[in-house]
C-alpha cells in the first residue's frame, strides 16, 4: 500500500474513533459523580457529565479542588463521558 493510502486509512480510523460514542461500560466511573465546584472562588466556566440526563452540563468551578467530573469544554466532556 502506498504512503498516501496508509495516510488516508489512518485518517479514516482516527475519524471513526472520534465519532464512536463511549458506552456506559467503558465510561470512567468519575463521570457518574455529581459536580464539585471546589473551595476557591475563581468562577471558571466548566462542564460536567450528568448521567441521568446523559449529557454535559455547564457549571461554575471555583478553580481548585473539586473532582474529576470537571472539563474545560463541552467537547472534552462529551469525548470522555457521553454516550
From Swiss-Prot:
Give the matching PROSITE patterns.
BPTI_KUNITZ_1, BPTI_KUNITZ_2
UniProt feature coiled coil, ranges: none
Q: What InterPro entries does the annotation carry?
A: Kunitz_BPTI, Kunitz_BPTI_sf, Prtase_inh_Kunz-CS, TFPI/VKTCI-like
Q: Which family does it belong to?
A: Belongs to the venom Kunitz-type family.
Which species does the entry assign this protein to?
A: Bungarus candidus (Malayan krait)
Provide the protein name. Answer: Kunitz-type serine protease inhibitor A
Cystine connections: 31-81, 40-64, 56-77
Q: Does the keyword ATP-binding apply?
A: no
Amino acid at each position: 500500500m502506498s504512503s498516501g493510502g496508509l495516510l488516508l486509512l489512518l485518517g479514516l480510523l482516527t475519524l471513526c474513533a472520534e465519532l464512536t460514542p463511549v458506552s456506559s461500560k467503558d465510561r470512567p466511573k468519575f463521570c457518574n459523580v455529581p459536580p464539585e465546584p471546589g473551595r476557591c472562588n475563581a468562577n471558571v466556566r466548566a462542564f460536567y457529565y450528568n448521567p441521568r440526563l446523559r449529557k454535559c452540563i455547564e457549571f461554575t468551578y471555583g478553580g481548585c479542588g473539586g473532582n474529576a467530573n470537571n472539563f474545560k469544554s463541552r467537547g472534552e466532556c462529551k469525548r470522555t463521558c457521553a454516550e
